[in-house]
Amino acid sequence: MPKTDACERMLQSIRSHKNSKLENQRLPAILLHSIDNYIDSKSLQRTASVYFSALLALIKQSNGFDYSSIYILSIVMPATPSDEKLLHIDLLYTQIVPYLQKNNDDAPTIRCALNCTQEFLLSFSNESKELYLKAVDVVMPLLVKFSVDLRPKVRKISIQVLQTLKQKYDGLLPHLYPAIFDELQRSLSEVSNMDNPSFSKGLHTLHLLECLVDINQASGSDLGIICNALSRILTSNIPTSEPIFEMSIKLILKVLSERIDALSDAVIYELCDSLIPYWYRALSVTLLLYDNFVNRNPSRGIKGIQTLLEKILDFCISPLQSSESDVEYDGATSSDILNSLKFLRNKFTMKFVNKKNWATVLSNGIKKVIKTITASSRHANYAKALPRCSVYLQLLLGAIPEDQISELLPAFSVVARAIIKNKLVETPECLDLFKIFIQKLASPTFLECLGFADNFCNIQKSHWLPEVFRDNITGETPETFFDCFLPTIEAGNSQWWELLPLYTKAGCITNNLNENTLKKLASAIYNDRSCHSHVAQAFVDLTKIENVRQLISSNSSNLIGVLGNTLATMKNDDSNAEDLVMAATSIFSVAGDQQLQIITNLCESAPLSEPSLGSTGVIKLFPALLSISPADTWKPFLPHLVKLFDIAIPSNLSQSLSVLNFGPGLAYRLLQATLSNERMISAIVPVISRLYDSMNSVGDGSQALPKYVALERLKTWKLLFKLLPNDEFHLLPSAIAEVVLFSKHHDDDLRAMAFELLVEVGNRMKNGGKINMSLIDGEEPNKTVVEANINEYISMISANLMNDSLNLKVSTIFALTRIFYEFSDYIDDDYVNAVLEEVQSSLQSNNQEIARAAVGFIKMYITSFTKSKVLFHLDTLLPLILRWIKEHNAYVKLKAKQLLDRMLRVFSLKELEAFAENETDKEWLQRIWRVRRSRGDKKVVDNKRDASDSEDLAIKNPMNKKAKVGKVDFRKHEKKLNKASMHRDKFSTGMHTSKRVQKKN
C-alpha cells in the first residue's frame, strides 16, 4: 500500500474515535478534527505535508508535545517528503531527543517519538550523509537504551528502528556496535555483581546482541569484548537453569565455533584462566577454549586439557567414590555436565595435539577408568557411573586420531562388558557408546570387545545388538556377516538376518563369497519366512558387486527356481512377494546365457494356463522378468500370450473371484511388460494387428470386469496405442469404441483413464498418419486411404452415435465433449456443425440420461468456442433449452438455467431475446438475467469455462478427483430439488429460490 494511502486510512481511523471513552483514542481525534477545520478554513488540501506543518506549528506554540500531537505526527511523517522533514531538523534535537532523555514513564508517547526519530534518520540517510551521522551519534545511545527496556512494546519498536536503519545504511555499524557493547558490559556487570539480581534487562541485552550483531562482521576486539562480558555470567553465582545463563552459553559457543581464530592470544588466555575454576558450569566453553589453546601455547594447553579431563573423569566416577546417589557441584547438576559432554562429542577434536602428547593425556585416564570400574562392581552407585563413563569415552573417541583408537579399546571393553552385565545397554548414553564405537571399529573387533567373538550364546541373547549395527555399518564386506552371525543363525536365531543388508548394501568388493554361501541364502528363503525381505535385499545388493556377478550368474537358474517355488507357496497379496520378485529380477538381469533355460523351467514348473496360479505370488514374477528380457528369449512366448485370453475356468473354481479373473488379469500384465520392453518392440510390431484382434475378441463385457482387471486392460490399450504404426490407424475404431464406453463408467479411476486415452489417441491422429478406410469393419471395400487428423478422429467417435445402444450413445457424447474441449482449435467448422446437429437432436430426447449428456456438451460448446460460432447455432439451441425449462423436472430445469446463465456471460440479454419464440421465453431470460444482476456479476466473459459443475469438470479435467462425473448422486436430493422448484414457481421473479437451489447444488 502506498504511504499516502496508508496515512489517509490511519487518519480516517483516528477521526472515527471522536466519541470514544478511551482517552488515548478520543484526544487525538479531537486534535485532528481541530486541525482539519483549520486546514479547511484556509482552503488548503489535506495532504501529509500540510498536516506536518500544522503539527510543527502547534508543537512550537505549545513549547513541547503531548501524546496526541506526537501520535498524529508519527502517522503523517512517513508520507511527508524528505526535503520538508530536513527543513525542520531542529524538532529532533530540541524536542524529541530531550524528551527521550528525560522521560521514561509514558510508553505510548515514547513509542511515537521513536517512530518520528526513525523517519528523521531515514530522511537524513537519503539526503545528507553528514546530517545522518550527526543525528546517529546523538540518538544511538537512546535507541540502545530503549532496546533493553522492560516494556515489551517500547523494546520492540526500538529494535525495529535499529534493524531498519541497519538495513538502509551499511555505515551504521561503527556507531551501532560500540553502543551495544557498552550496554552489554554495563548490564551484565550489574547482573553478575548484584546479590539478588533481576535478569530481565541482561536477557534483553543478550537478545539485542543476537539480533543486531553479526558475528562474522565483528572485529577481533569486538568479539573479545563480547566473550569477556559473557564470561562474567558464566563465572557468577547465577543458577545454570536461568535463561540468561543458557543464552550466554549459546552466544559464546557461537563465537568460539565460528570465529575463535579471530580472538587474540590475550583474550584466550584470560578466558581459560577465568573459566577453569568453574569448568562444571561452562564445560563446553572451557574445553573448546583449551582445544584452541594448545595451538597457541602447546605446553600450557596440554596441561590445561589434562587437568580438565581429569576433572571430567572424577565427575564420571564420583558416584563410586561416595555413598551419595549424586554429587552436586556449585550451581550445576550432573545432568548439565552430561549434556555438555554430549554436546562436545564431535566438536572437541584435539587436532593440534600430537601422538606423544595424546599418550600423556590418555594414559592416566584410561588406567583410572579400568581400575575404578573393575574394582567397584558391587558399589551401590555402580549403575550410576557406567553411563557417565560411557559419555567420557565418547568424548575421547570423537577427539582421538584414527590411528590412536586402539589405545581406548581396553577401557571400552571393560565399560562395555560391565554395561551388558548390568543390563544398562538400553540407556541412551550406553547405547550411543556402542553405536559410536561400531562406526570406528570393524565388526569382529567390536564383538571381541563385547566378549561375543567366541561365545555365540551371548549374541543370541542380545536383542539390542541389531539396533546398534543398524545404520552404523560402513565399508564392511558380506563375509564379515557370514563369519560373525551365520553360525548363530544356523543355531536357530533367524532374527540376525536383518543385519545382512547392512553388509551387502555398501557394495564392497568381496573375494571369499562361494557357492555354498549362496545355497545357504537360498535355503533360508525357502525355509524361513522371517528372512525373506532381508535376504532378498541382499541378493539385489550382491548383483551390483562386480566380482560377485559371475558367481550369481552361474547359479542363477537354481536361485530363481528357489525363489519361484517360494512364490508359488505364497498368497498373491503377501507383503514379501514384491521383495522376492525384486531379487529374482536382479538375479535374472545378470543370468546371461541362462535366461532362456530359466524361462523354460519357470513355464514348466508353473504353467501359465493353470487358473489356480492366480492366487499365488508367482504371477508377479512373470511380468517382472518379461519387462527386462531380450527379445529372442521371449519370441516363442508371444503366441502363447495371445492364447492366454481364452483360458477356460473349471466350474469348481468359478466361485473364487481371484481365480475367476486371473487369466485376463495376468495376460494384460504380461502383455504390458512385453510392450514396455524396448528390446521387445521389434518382435511385437509384426504381430500388432494380431494383438489388437485378440484384445477385441475378449473385449465383450469389459464394462462388467472388476476394477483391477479393467484398469489393466486400459493400461494395455495405452501401450498398444503408443506402438501402433502410423499406417495402421484402421485398427483404432473398435478399440476406441471400448474406451468410449469406459468414459461413462461409474468408477472415477476408470473414467479418468478412459479420458486420458482418448486425448492421447487424439494427439496421435493430430500429428498425422494413414487410415485405410477399406480395412475398417462395416466400410465399403473399395474406399481409399485418407490422412489422419482430428476431423477423422471425430468421425470415428461420432459414428457411435448411430448405434442403437443407449449406453454407447451417452458415452459417445461424453467422449466428444472432452475431445472438442481439448482440440477445439483443430476441428473444422463442418465437423463442428455436424456433431452439434446430432447433439441438438439428443437435447430433444425424452431420455433424461441422453439429454443430460447433451447439456454437458452444449455447456462446453458455449464457453470453449468463439462467440461467432455459437451465434451460428443460437436460433436452434435457445428454443431447445427454453423447452427444457418448461417440460422437465427440477434437476433438468436447474441444468437448463445454468446453460442460459452461461449464455448470458457470452451474449447480452437483447441478443438472446431476439431468438426467443414467445413472451414466456423472454420472461425466463429476463428472470435469469435479474438473478445474475442481483449477484453483482455484470461481467461478460468470452471463451471462459465455469468450474462450478462437477459433471462437466470431470469431462474436461478427469484427473481432478474432487469433481468427477457421477460424484454427486442427484437422486438422493431429488425430493429437495422438486420442493425447491415448487417454492420457486410461487414467485414471479424466482430470484430468491433460484439462488437457494444453486447454492445447494
Curated annotation (Swiss-Prot):
Sites of Phosphoserine modification: S948, S950
> Keywords in UniProt for this one?
Phosphoprotein
> Where is the secretion signal located?
none
Task: Report the protein name in the record.
Answer: Uncharacterized protein C1105.01
Ranges annotated as biased composition (Basic and acidic residues):
939-948
One cellular-component annotation, GO? nucleus
Q: Which domain of life is it from?
A: Eukaryota
Q: Region (Disordered): which ranges?
A: 939-1001
Keyword Ribonucleoprotein tagged: no
UniProt xrefs under InterPro entries: ARM-like, ARM-type_fold, RRP12
The UniProt entry's GO biological process terms, in alphabetical order, are: maturation of SSU-rRNA
